[in-house]
Structure formats: structure tokens, C-alpha cells
Curated annotation (Swiss-Prot):
It comes from the Eukaryota. Residues 58-83, 146-167 are extracellular. It is a multi-pass membrane protein. Belongs to the Casparian strip membrane proteins (CASP) family. Pfam families: CASP_dom. It is found in: Cell membrane. The keyword Cell membrane applies. Homodimer and heterodimers. This is CASP-like protein 1U1. Residues 1-36, 105-124, 189-201 are cytoplasmic. It comes from Picea sitchensis.
Amino acid sequence: MESRTKLDYSETARSYTENKSGGNDAQRINGVYSSSFFVVDFSLRLLVIGSTFTAAIVMGTNKQTAILPIVGPLSAKYQYSPAFVFFVIANAVACGYTLLSLIFSITGKFTSTPLSVFLLSVTDLVMVALVSAGVSAAAAIAYVGYKGNSHTQWGKVCGIYDRFCHHGAGAIVASFVSLIIFMVLTVMSTYSFYRRTSSAR
């Protein structure tokens, strides 16, 4: 009877030790994942800030005056196209949001609870939609400027306003880069929310 009691005690102690060790391993793995996730998320959001800021500034300061025969001087400015105005606003909003989310991530506001991670993934998705709409509208106008449209008799203007078109193209490329990164961030934040909710069960 005594030997059986000792055997049961030994098995219980071994089981407790294994469970504790397994729990420590899981915590260690989660800790490594969390730190790696933070580094990648932080780096990508820095890139988004840089690309959206560049896109908004380059397009927002884009203008050129050309001298045309008979007509005289004519100016091209981003304000003359509602699509370009929306492009600047969309990238400025995305830049401001990303800066705030970066600050909140550093302080742990967006990574402390599953709800905050869920809100982060939703707002990242909203930014994907906003930047996508802005860059698509600007790209459509830029294409007409480069190629024209023979069906509607819209002529090319980039042969006249070459610098304006080149700067606009650079801003659009920068915005496309930020759009791709936002998509990656949305996937990451959604997966992080999934991990937190599944581990809480």
C-alpha cells in the first residue's frame, strides 16, 4: 500500500513537472513570436509612413507652367484634378493613422487585448480601401495624361507638362508601395487576433 502511494505521488510529480515545462515552452514560443511580430510590424509601419508621406508631399507640391504657342503660359496643378486632391487626402490620412498606430503599438495600446488587436486589423483594412481608392483614381487620370483617349478626343498632356507627370508618377508608385504594405499589415494583424482568441479558449 505504501509503495503504491509513493508510485502515485511520483507519477503526479512527474506529470506536474512535464506540464509546467510544456507551459514554459509555450510561453517562451509565444514570447519569441510576440517580439518578432512587433519588430516586423514596427518596421512595416515605418515604411508606410515614409511612402504615404512622400506620396502626399510630392503630389501636393506638384505643379508646372508651360509656354504654349499662341495660347501663352498655362499651369498644371494637382488642385485642378479632384482625383489628385483625393489622392493627397487619402495618403495624408493614411500617414497620420499609421503614425498614431505606431505610437500606440510602442505603448502597448494596440497589442494588450484581443479587442485592441481586432480594432487594429479593422482600421488597417479601412486604410487599404482608402489608399486603394486614392491611388486608383490618380492612376486613371495619370494614364489619360500619358496616353490620351482617342475615343473621347482627349489629347496627351505629358508631352507638355513632362515634369508634372513624372512627379505625379513617382507619387503614385510610392502610394502603391504603401498599399501593398498595408495589405501585409492587415494579414498580420488578423492572424495576431486569431492567435490571441484561440489561445484564450
